[in-house]
Structure formats: C-alpha cells, structure tokens
From Swiss-Prot:
<dbReference type="InterPro" id="IPR013087">
    <property type="entry name" value="Znf_C2H2_type"/>
</dbReference>
<protein>
    <recommendedName>
        <fullName>Zinc finger protein C25B8.19c</fullName>
    </recommendedName>
</protein>
<dbReference type="GO" id="GO:0006882">
    <property type="term" value="P:intracellular zinc ion homeostasis"/>
</dbReference>
<feature type="region of interest" description="Disordered">
    <location>
        <begin position="61"/>
        <end position="96"/>
    </location>
</feature>
<feature type="compositionally biased region" description="Low complexity">
    <location>
        <begin position="453"/>
        <end position="462"/>
    </location>
</feature>
<dbReference type="GO" id="GO:0000122">
    <property type="term" value="P:negative regulation of transcription by RNA polymerase II"/>
</dbReference>
<feature type="compositionally biased region" description="Low complexity">
    <location>
        <begin position="345"/>
        <end position="362"/>
    </location>
</feature>
<feature type="compositionally biased region" description="Polar residues">
    <location>
        <begin position="335"/>
        <end position="344"/>
    </location>
</feature>
<feature type="compositionally biased region" description="Basic and acidic residues">
    <location>
        <begin position="428"/>
        <end position="438"/>
    </location>
</feature>
<keyword id="KW-0479">Metal-binding</keyword>
<feature type="compositionally biased region" description="Low complexity">
    <location>
        <begin position="84"/>
        <end position="96"/>
    </location>
</feature>
<feature type="region of interest" description="Disordered">
    <location>
        <begin position="1"/>
        <end position="25"/>
    </location>
</feature>
<keyword id="KW-0677">Repeat</keyword>
<feature type="zinc finger region" description="C2H2-type 2">
    <location>
        <begin position="496"/>
        <end position="522"/>
    </location>
</feature>
<dbReference type="GO" id="GO:0001227">
    <property type="term" value="F:DNA-binding transcription repressor activity, RNA polymerase II-specific"/>
</dbReference>
<dbReference type="GO" id="GO:0043565">
    <property type="term" value="F:sequence-specific DNA binding"/>
</dbReference>
<feature type="region of interest" description="Disordered">
    <location>
        <begin position="413"/>
        <end position="462"/>
    </location>
</feature>
Amino acid sequence: MSSDNTPSINRRNNENPPQSSLPTTSGIVYNMFPACPYPHVQNPAFHGSVDVPQVAQKAFDPQAATVSESANVSRPTPAPVPPAGNTNTPTTSNSNQNLENNVTSAASMPAILNAAGQLEFSPSTNNALCCCTTVHGHPHMPPNLLAASSARLRLPPISTILGGTFADPTFLAAAAAAAVPHYAHATTGSATDASNTSNGNSNPAAVPAGFLSGYSPLSYAYFVAKANELALANQRQSSEAAEQPSSKNNTSGANPPSSNNQEVTSAPIPAAPIVLPFQQPFYPIVCPGCAQGALPQHIPVPHNTEFAQYQPSSRDLQNHPTVDESRLSSVAPPASNTLNHANGNQAENASESSTSQSNDSQGPANTSYPVSVPLPNDAENNHTLSRNPYIPSLNFKDNMSAELSVVATLASNSAQAHPMGQQSDSNYSDHHNNDKRAHVSRRHSTSRKIAQSHTGSSSTSSAANVRYRCTECLQGFSRPSSLKIHTYSHTGERPFVCDYAGCGKAFNVRSNMRRHQRIHGL
C-alpha cells in the first residue's frame, strides 16, 4: 500500500515506525497523536462479563452455539503477541489467559460485512490496545475533534459514558465520541503483523481487539464504533483494490486482510463519503496524557443526515426560555375599559396609602410597589430580563431598579392601551408624592420623640411612677440615676473622662465613655 501522504507513529522503542493510510471522512481528518506516556498491553482483561440475550447473541455472533438467555457470552482469544522491540510488554500466564477467556465477549471482536450483508466477527484478530482504556477506563477520541480550550479538561465518569443510549440525548454524544477508534496507538505494518499474518491472524483495521469490550452490544457507543470500523474496512478494501498492481511488488508495506475477508467478493467497493453518526461531543473525551502537545486542526461540522440530528443543549435552553403565562398575567396591563382602569387606579392608590401608614419604619422606596412583583417579559424582542444568562441576577436587597422597571413598563403599557387614562396617571403621581412628604414628616416627628426620651423627658411616664423631681425644671423621674444624669445637663458636668493617652474626652454617662473606649481598643 502506498504511504506518501501518511504520518508516522513515534514509538517508545525509537524504531522507524511503519506508515499506514488513515481515513479521511467528510469534514473530519484523523491525524496522529503524540506517543502515549503509558506502557501498552496486549488484549487486557476486562473485569466482568457482558450479558447478551439469546436474540442479540444470534444477531451479533451467528457462529456461537445455542446458549440460554441468562448465560454469559464468552469467546476465547488467542495468546497476545508482543510488539517487535518492546521488552516491557508483560507476558500472559495461564491464569490471565483463563481470565480473558471468561470476560472477553463477542462484542469485543471486530466485524466486517460479508457478501450477504451480515456481520462477521474475527476472533483471530490480535491488536494492541491503548493503555489509556485500562488505566483511565475511557477509550480515546482524537484531539482534533475538540476545541483548543477544552482539550485538557477532565473526563466524565466511565459509568456516564457506558450508560449512554438512544433514550438519553445528553450523554449520547459523549458515548458516541468515546467509541471513535484510536488510530494512533494501533500496531500496523510491524514485524508483529507479519507473524500474525503467517499464523492466520491479521490486522485489517487499526481498531484494537478489546476496544468494545467495555460497552454493551445494545448501546449507542457500540453502534458508532461498529459503524466507524465498517467504514474504515470499506475504505481499506477500496484502496487495496486500486493499488493491487503495486502491492504485488511490495507486500511487506501493506497489511493483508483478515481471514474473514476471504469470503467477501473480490469486486471492489467504490469509495463513498463516510458520514460518522455523531456530533461534536458535549463532554471532552480525551486522555490528558495523550493530549499533551496535540492541538485540534479541524473541528467536525455536523451534516444534515439522519444520524446527525440537532440536539438542543443546555445553553440553547437558557438563551430561549419558555414563557411562564402566570408571570405574564401578573404584570399584564389593565383591561381596555376606561372605567375599569380608573377604578383600578383608585384601588391601587388606597392600597398604597394603607401600606405607607402601616410601615412607618421602612424607607419611601418600599412603599411604591411590593418587592415580589416579577420582572416583565418583552414579547416583541423575545427577551427576558430575569432569565438572561449574561445579566447578573437581580435577587439582592436593593430592588429599586427592578421596581422602577416594573413601574415604567406598566406606565407605558397603560398609556398605549388607554390614551384617556393619562389624567388618572398624573393624579396617581401627585398622590404618591404627597404620601412621600407625609411619610418623611412622620419619621421626623418620631426622631424628635426619641431624642427627647434620651434627654430625660418623662412625658410618656405616668404620674404614679414619678418619685424624684429636678429642682431646676421640676421634671419627674422614677430612678435616682436618671435624675443625676439629668442634673448634669443643667450644671454642664462631664465627670467620666477617657483615660487613653492623648484623648481625655469627657462624658456625662459612663456607658457612653466605655463605648468610646472601644475605638482605642481598651
């Protein structure tokens, strides 16, 4: 096979890597990864087995024997062959081999289409599996499918990816992206492939043998991986058919097809654009170790096909929120009848005056509208102030801006719907200003009463409680301490002096002096 436009893999043993052709799909170009920092293994054992019903077993593995529905489907795998020049690859013992025979299911075996259009599994395939699948629990995704800002983010939980099905569109794209074959860490064109070819084993596609063992055959990730694998095998067959004269002279540079490919008809399949049935993922599925130094070169654009359907994301739902009719009805303008509008303004004025009389301790801003009035929605611009993600939340103590916006909206809606109601609006504004003046005067009178009580006024006390009277002004007091403090106002005495160095401030009440000394830290 020709290798003019194919990049190479920098292996750990610093050997000259073989070159292989990589698929170029519609909108997606697969590039090579940097060397994986972790050691590679051959056919790792996945703990646990896959339960496959009998119907699904017959559909995926026609060669399997009849098994009960509750039995675990297991297929034996051959002993792994270490790559050439890699001395760090662990050898598989008898116990490890038995473990692999128990846990490797038919779902982990690559498949191709035969002449009848049925899936055929190749149990003899023995490819290298990237260690990141076993260390991190996640298959790889090419970094060029991710944005530059999200290439170094953490991975989602493996249970989240494995649980992605057609019924869960949120995790559907993540599971699909996780099932993309890892083209960089597959051993192609090495001495290992030559030995596998002589033994009847081959490497028809750069997809690891145990790549799908962590997925259920009925999951969406399994379907996507199978679709990508078939597309890659299809392209390899078309490229081999086009380069058949040159491959006779140089057979070591191309990977021969697997044993199952011999049953496929020799007619070359025309190359067609491959549309991968997944979009740009919601979650970045990439190994942090293999993503170092790798920048995306091409981001896929979803095609308008039956597989790439648009799924609304959470950001789209925030930008286009649903309209709450109850909130709209609470701030809707009054009816079109002029008489009802005038009566509504009178009732509103009465409620405002009663609110201002009952809440004397509150500020004048709280008497205009209650704080619980929701913000209005502009139906013409499809804009919601309270739900705009780019505007900070208005749920703070000072709701003056929210109240003013409500007042302005109600006034504008009333003016547009009722041109004859301008006089009532002006009357309402005059009445509101009068209420504010009266409220300020009441607060001023209350402050005067409080000041008089601090100076020793006994106007609020009854005559029965008066036991002591001032000889100067004849004011009555119930306690002698109050009379003594009052006497200082006539004599001008300040017997309590701050003893802090350099201060010397005098007070007529001891508690006031102690409160002052807190400033000095005493």
